[in-house]
Amino acid sequence: MAPRKNSKTQQPTGDNRKKALDAALAMIEKDFGKGAVMRLGDENRPPISAISSGNTAIDVALGIGGFPRGRIVEVYGPESSGKTTVALHAIAQAQKAGGIAAFIDAEHALDPDYARKLGVDTDALLVSQPDTGEQALEIADMLVRSGAIDIIVIDSVAALTPKAEIEGEMGDSHVGLQARLMSQALRKMTGALYNSGTTAIFINQLREKIGVMFGSPETTTGGKALKFYASVRCDVRRIQTLKDGQDAIGNRTRLKVVKNKVSPPFKIAEFDIMYGEGISRESSIIDLGVDNGIIKKSGSWFTYEGDQLGQGKEKVRLYLKETPELADEIEDKIFRALHIGKYAALKDADDALTDDPVDMVPNVDFDDSDDD
């Protein structure tokens, strides 16, 4: 009986390992193009850029000064909690920076007048109101692959109805169709979003699981794929009604970053959404300014660098709204103090100084003179 041949691949040793790796890398580069495989240290990657949310508190909670470019973001919460308002403010900021924005209105509920009040350039905004979920996601994918879009908002995942469900009868069962649709779409879009630097914000609704005895029964629609593919997930909740006398003028809202792949998660932002006006940037500047010692508060008076801003938060808010240069200056100091956005490099420098071995040397008296 002939001896059986050993089919195990011979492991190269010493310098042969490097030669074998170089040959494999050369073949991969030839077949798939330059950059298909690279050493992580070979390329100097810039910090992750972001699109501002338009609100100081949210930008601080996100950790990088806004929603990350080239990534998927999920914004979910109960009805009328401010999800679409958050997304529209991000669109307005992208447009102010010279970017192009798109809005996939699967709910057919976009209010152009309200969007305009939030600062959105509705004349330049690309809007699609698709008939089916497949059509919505295909349009979104084509826009992303064009490489010309800075931000795209899909409102909402729950409204992305599969074609089979629309064409079927009302009582037909279509278990798992939407989850499979989302899973396939996200597999296709993730790479295209990264390559184009487009931020995709998926707005999602909440549902309750039946029979849950322990833990939260709340869950989001569209299956689990979005939870995995999203780099940032934000839970938006209305926590208080703001009143002027007996009249409701807005909501106090809490945004919790429940997942964050680009910065430490679980940070919380609280901000005011004023009816007909949107998120109040000035209120967040006042709150964060006081918290970080940039604005001094004495009783009901607010002071900045020795100058009185006004008495009462509402009057100071209106004053900052009338003087945007001052609001920008205070916001910039907040970002600097918290090492957010362009000031993130300062934190690395501070950490390097803190970790300096010289600082760790105990205080020792090296004086050789006798005490006698």
From Swiss-Prot:
<protein>
    <recommendedName>
        <fullName>Protein RecA</fullName>
    </recommendedName>
</protein>
<keyword id="KW-0227">DNA damage</keyword>
<dbReference type="GO" id="GO:0009432">
    <property type="term" value="P:SOS response"/>
</dbReference>
<dbReference type="InterPro" id="IPR020587">
    <property type="entry name" value="RecA_monomer-monomer_interface"/>
</dbReference>
<dbReference type="InterPro" id="IPR049428">
    <property type="entry name" value="RecA-like_N"/>
</dbReference>
<dbReference type="InterPro" id="IPR049261">
    <property type="entry name" value="RecA-like_C"/>
</dbReference>
<dbReference type="InterPro" id="IPR020584">
    <property type="entry name" value="DNA_recomb/repair_RecA_CS"/>
</dbReference>
<keyword id="KW-0238">DNA-binding</keyword>
<keyword id="KW-0233">DNA recombination</keyword>
<dbReference type="InterPro" id="IPR027417">
    <property type="entry name" value="P-loop_NTPase"/>
</dbReference>
<dbReference type="GO" id="GO:0140664">
    <property type="term" value="F:ATP-dependent DNA damage sensor activity"/>
</dbReference>
<comment type="similarity">
    <text>Belongs to the RecA family.</text>
</comment>
<dbReference type="GO" id="GO:0003684">
    <property type="term" value="F:damaged DNA binding"/>
</dbReference>
<dbReference type="GO" id="GO:0016887">
    <property type="term" value="F:ATP hydrolysis activity"/>
</dbReference>
<dbReference type="GO" id="GO:0003697">
    <property type="term" value="F:single-stranded DNA binding"/>
</dbReference>
<keyword id="KW-0963">Cytoplasm</keyword>
<dbReference type="Pfam" id="PF00154">
    <property type="entry name" value="RecA"/>
</dbReference>
<dbReference type="InterPro" id="IPR020588">
    <property type="entry name" value="RecA_ATP-bd"/>
</dbReference>
<dbReference type="InterPro" id="IPR003593">
    <property type="entry name" value="AAA+_ATPase"/>
</dbReference>
<dbReference type="InterPro" id="IPR023400">
    <property type="entry name" value="RecA_C_sf"/>
</dbReference>
<comment type="function">
    <text>Can catalyze the hydrolysis of ATP in the presence of single-stranded DNA, the ATP-dependent uptake of single-stranded DNA by duplex DNA, and the ATP-dependent hybridization of homologous single-stranded DNAs. It interacts with LexA causing its activation and leading to its autocatalytic cleavage.</text>
</comment>
<dbReference type="GO" id="GO:0005829">
    <property type="term" value="C:cytosol"/>
</dbReference>
<dbReference type="GO" id="GO:0006310">
    <property type="term" value="P:DNA recombination"/>
</dbReference>
<dbReference type="GO" id="GO:0006281">
    <property type="term" value="P:DNA repair"/>
</dbReference>
<dbReference type="GO" id="GO:0005524">
    <property type="term" value="F:ATP binding"/>
</dbReference>
<dbReference type="Pfam" id="PF21096">
    <property type="entry name" value="RecA_C"/>
</dbReference>
<keyword id="KW-0547">Nucleotide-binding</keyword>
<keyword id="KW-0234">DNA repair</keyword>
<dbReference type="InterPro" id="IPR013765">
    <property type="entry name" value="DNA_recomb/repair_RecA"/>
</dbReference>
<feature type="binding site">
    <location>
        <begin position="77"/>
        <end position="84"/>
    </location>
    <ligand>
        <name>ATP</name>
    </ligand>
</feature>
<keyword id="KW-0067">ATP-binding</keyword>
<keyword id="KW-0742">SOS response</keyword>
